[in-house]
Amino acid sequence: MYRYKITIEYLGTHFAGWQRQAGVLSVQQILEEAIYKFSSEQVTLFGSGRTDAGVHAIGQVAHFDLSKYLEPYKIIKAINYFVRPYDVGVWNCELVSNNFHARFSAISRHYIYRIINRTYPSVIDFNRAWWISSPLDILAMQKAAAYLLGKHDFTSFRSSSCQSKSPIKTLTEINIIKEYEEIKLYISAPSFLHYMVRNIVGSLVLVGKNIWQAEQIKNVLDARDRKIAGPTAPAFGLYFIKAEY
């Protein structure tokens, strides 16, 4: 068998998420069907992260196996031909060892959350960034974010449906910058809990609005109680940037 690693970008707006589900459109389904159309092989695509409905990706990584060898550049062209009706595309493909696994071989995952912070909404970024009209205090958000760096119990920031066995995660990066009217939150970790990034962003926005003091983030973290954390930020502002191996 030949194992291929592909790097994918997609707009999550019209997808029910990455993972194949009965009765709804998923990124995994569209790609698996495209691969079948040119290879005549039923494959299972394994992704580095299972993005939720509405979440976008710039560098999602996945792998699949084929029984016959095909040039990687031909795979890129073939997949992109068959996924043309959808907001998804492959921009890299390479042959990898059969020991490689897109999910389990990953040592770090990187996300960015985009906020448009101005008095009027953005037409261009509709469904691609969270619009917040009230000014956000970036310095306060940065101070609050520092409490989340490192290894912690992130129970307060996981969804009620999270299936992870442990709430202990290690944030290796949480960087907040402002570029003109856009605020970008860069968040990295080896792995995440379900809704963890969006729940963190929702809480940091409360700090940015001066509803919370920065120190409240530490109180929320220590409480290990989802009910006292902030709201879940909208899915459409979140982007899976890359996985590292």
Swiss-Prot record:
Catalytic reaction list: uridine(38/39/40) in tRNA = pseudouridine(38/39/40) in tRNA
The protein's GO terms of the molecular function aspect are:
RNA binding; tRNA pseudouridine(38-40) synthase activity
Which EC numbers does the record give? 5.4.99.12
* Gene3D superfamilies in UniProt: Pseudouridine synthase I, catalytic domain, C-terminal subdomain, Pseudouridine synthase I, catalytic domain, N-terminal subdomain
Q: Where is the active site?
A: 52 (nucleophile)
The answer, when asked if Transcription is one of the entry's keywords, is: no
Please give the Pfam families that the UniProt record associates with this protein: PseudoU_synth_1 (PF01416)
Q: How does it assemble?
A: Homodimer.
Name of the protein in question: tRNA pseudouridine synthase A
